[in-house]
Amino acid sequence: SKGHALLLPKSHAANIYELSDEMAAKAMILAKKMATAMTAALKCDGFNIVQNNGECAGQTVFHFHMHLIF
């Protein structure tokens, strides 16, 4: 990949289920801003957002976060 960014809130939520609606909205707005800037800077055609919830889904860090992978 050309780049990888991590987005996480300062306030604790173990996963998306514990995330407040307000924080979820803020996270997606910031993810869009980051994706727009990184896509332009890295000259990518697209990217992936990864967000795992629960051990069975591969979550190993139990603080909500999203990976933006370019």
Regions found by a protein language model. Give the residues of each.
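HIT superfamily nucleotide-processing domains
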Residues: 1-70
